[in-house]
Amino acid sequence: MNIKQIQRNKDVINECEDLEYLDKFDSYPVFMGCVNQPIKDDILIDMQWGISKNSGIIQLSSLLPLDVLYSEDHGAGVVGTMWLDHHKEFAKFIQKQSPQSILEIGGSHGILSREYKKMNDIDWTILEPNPVPAADVDAVFIKGFFDDKFIFNGEIDAIVHSH
């Protein structure tokens, strides 16, 4: 598969056009997760890193289009008690801010919303390219990306992103 990468020419922090080539990982797998296909069908890409001479920040200098990077759910935040504990603690932190409505960016399964709503039942919307709602999740899901094309017409007073 021939994928056209997007070249980053500016530092993501200060927008200086001073990225200097640092290193490259050849033939790096695009998808992070379990698959049902043979390894020969994996999508591989050269992962290239650069460093900003001004800020010292190391960052990807070649980017994948979002629809390739997030072509399917990778299960982050779903497996294991450590993730469940993370969502419960993050929900407690959010509650201290007393939001009335939340937009969650990338909440694939909705577990954070479910755990929060056990304490306070509020409007919760999740923007996710590959929604896979867990049991007992009643959040509203919007299939999509948080990019320059995204427009949210609802009312929110908090935006969260859990990982």
Where is each model-derived feature located?
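N-terminal juxtadomain amphipathic helix
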Residues: 1-82
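Glycine-rich loops and low-complexity Gly/Arg-rich segments
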Residues: 45-47, 76-77, 85, 129, ...
